[in-house]
């Protein structure tokens, strides 16, 4: 499955027509590539989704490709396991994640009496935590009402491992297991990207590393001493642009203490970062 998208900030008819032409051109290139490699593109499984703000109510016309195939707009598409809607609210993705995780948790509860207590955490990591950590960087810019819904999954898992009762504190169970909350795990993932952008750009994709540069001035300033980042992209819309991973990397990295930014090795940085986020999440400062 090939997923092609475009970003139209201006919203004018001319820009939309140009973007449609680019998508049709990209589709023909992909189709030619597959034909040369003895593959056939299935138009019935090809999806087209326009992304827009909630206030934009204009309907989008179907996309007509070069081979006269008509693709109608979809409200939701699945891309690499993540369900994306036209407003990028990720409500459907969170609902699907909760259903799959709680289904796995119910299955594990049925065999808990046969599993040693020392192996319960391993089972949780294999069947549920791996789902929570997959593409977890999208949880950081989620609306505030959705993050607690994801957090309830981890809370139930923590009580399952520790044997806590229904009305016991989930925070105490997570603290006992030394688990970072969902929001902190998302920050951890994004900050590991930021560290590789600053220190080892060859280990990060170019589309993530190219917009960034370290702040340098002609004289000694606090920014020079703090190893802060600067992004060439301009974020015009707070509710949309500032939810992007580019803005999240910039904000979270520049908010870190300067001693964490200068840690020389990636392994030591991850260890120190987890300790910092753990103390911050459970207010241990």
Residue ranges and their predicted role:
Residues 1-285:
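Hydrophobic/basic alpha-helical segments
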């Amino acid at each position: 499955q090939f997923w092609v998208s475009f970003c139209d900030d201006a919203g004018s008819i001319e820009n939309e027509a140009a973007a449609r032409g680019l998508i049709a051109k990209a589709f023909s290139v992909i189709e030619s590539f597959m034909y040369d490699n003895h593959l056939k593109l299935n138009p019935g499984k090809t999806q087209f989704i326009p992304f827009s703000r909630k206030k934009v109510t204009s309907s989008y016309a179907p996309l007509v490709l070069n081979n006269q195939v008509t693709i109608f707009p979809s409200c939701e598409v699945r891309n690499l396991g993540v369900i994306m809607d036209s407003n990028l609210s990720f409500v459907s993705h969170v609902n699907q994640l909760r259903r799959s995780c709680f289904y796995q948790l119910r299955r594990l509860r049925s065999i808990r009496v046969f599993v040693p207590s020392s192996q319960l955490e391993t089972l949780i990591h294999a069947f549920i935590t791996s789902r929570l950590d997959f593409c977890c960087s999208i949880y950081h810019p989620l609306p505030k009402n959705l993050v607690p819904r994801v957090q309830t999954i981890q809370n139930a898992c923590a009580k399952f491992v520790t044997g806590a009762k229904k009305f016991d504190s989930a925070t105490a169970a997570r603290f006992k297991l030394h688990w970072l909350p969902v929001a902190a795990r998302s920050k951890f993932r994004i900050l590991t990207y930021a560290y590789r952008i600053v220190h080892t750009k060859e280990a990060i994709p170019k589309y993530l590393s190219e917009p960034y540069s370290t702040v340098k001035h002609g004289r000694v300033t606090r920014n020079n001493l703090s190893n802060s980042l600067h992004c060439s992209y301009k974020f015009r819309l707070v509710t949309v642009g500032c939810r992007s991973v580019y803005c999240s990397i910039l904000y979270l990295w520049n908010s870190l203490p300067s001693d964490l930014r200068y840690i020389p090795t990636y392994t030591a940085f991850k260890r120190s970062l987890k300790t910092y986020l753990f103390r911050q999440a459970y207010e241990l400062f």
